[in-house]
């Protein structure tokens, strides 16, 4: 069964039946409207975010499967902070603030794409991204929180999410 993979970035819940997607789907003999509808349904929980999607198409039967990836860490942090774009000057202009708990939940969501093995390391990675886009955490510079996480100040909070972290497949 010869399969073709189409890898694209789409706006969650807002895929349009235009180029470059439509011509590619048409060439493979797929109903563009139907695929777009299913893409919008599959990505609706990531509304407004860029989401990586893979469409696996069986060239013989025209059956297809949609695999939705996880949005970028930046996109998840921005959505959680309620802003649409990163700060152009993250050192001086802060665009939002998150709780450490929100950052932990994003780390858990991103686990399948991370190379880190521990929740603590994943959270520190998320904090690095938060710093680079101008988002504070617990009303502090994320760099300060990285130090506090390393010192064990948030071990109790991290322990609360350890089971959830361990349940996520890599």
Curated annotation (Swiss-Prot):
MF GO annotations: large ribosomal subunit rRNA binding; structural constituent of ribosome
Gene3D superfamilies registered for this protein in UniProt: Ribosomal protein L11, C-terminal domain, Ribosomal protein L11/L12, N-terminal domain
Cited PANTHER family: 60S RIBOSOMAL PROTEIN L12, LARGE RIBOSOMAL SUBUNIT PROTEIN UL11M
GO cellular component assignments: large ribosomal subunit
Provenance organism: Saccharolobus islandicus (strain M.14.25 / Kamchatka #1) (Sulfolobus islandicus)
Family: Belongs to the universal ribosomal protein uL11 family.
InterPro entries: Ribosomal_uL11, Ribosomal_uL11_C, Ribosomal_uL11_C_sf, Ribosomal_uL11_CS, Ribosomal_uL11_N, Ribosomal_uL11_N_sf
Protein name: Large ribosomal subunit protein uL11
Function: Forms part of the ribosomal stalk which helps the ribosome interact with GTP-bound translation factors.
CDD domains in the cross-refs: Ribosomal_L11
